[in-house]
């Protein structure tokens, strides 16, 4: 697994599993909202009234509507915060 995906996959999987509503901001500024149905290495399937396949290279930011527990040892991803806390390590 690539080092860049060691946080990405558990984060997206937690959002998918818990059906957390998300706002997805694209690099062109467009905001999409819905829940993550599925994802792979290249795309995220976002569901609202319809399903949209969004290419990851077009995504700037994914903002969950509520806090999400990530991984078995699990810290939380705090929505609306500039600090991401995972497994007691802080990344700003």
Curated annotation (Swiss-Prot):
Q: What is this protein called?
A: RNA-binding protein Hfq
Question: Could you tell me which residue ranges the Sm domain spans?
Answer: 9-68
Q: Name one GO molecular function term.
A: RNA binding
Q: Which NCBIfam families match?
A: Hfq, PRK00395.1
Single GO cellular component annotation?
cytosol
Annotated function: RNA chaperone that binds small regulatory RNA (sRNAs) and mRNAs to facilitate mRNA translational regulation in response to envelope stress, environmental stress and changes in metabolite concentrations. Also binds with high specificity to tRNAs.
Q: Supply the CDD domains for this chain.
A: Hfq (cd01716)
Q: Which InterPro entries match?
A: Hfq, LSM_dom_sf, Sm
Q: Which residues form a coiled coil?
A: none
Instruction: Answer yes or no on keyword RNA-binding.
Output: yes
A Pfam family matched by this chain, by name?
A: Hfq
Q: How does it assemble?
A: Homohexamer.
What is this organism's lineage? Bacteria, Pseudomonadati, Pseudomonadota, Gammaproteobacteria, Lysobacterales
What processes does the entry annotate via GO biological process terms? regulation of DNA-templated transcription; regulation of RNA stability; regulation of translation, ncRNA-mediated
What the record says about family reads: Belongs to the Hfq family.
Q: Which SUPFAM superfamilies does the protein's record reference? A: Sm-like ribonucleoproteins
Q: Which UniProt keywords apply?
A: RNA-binding, Stress response
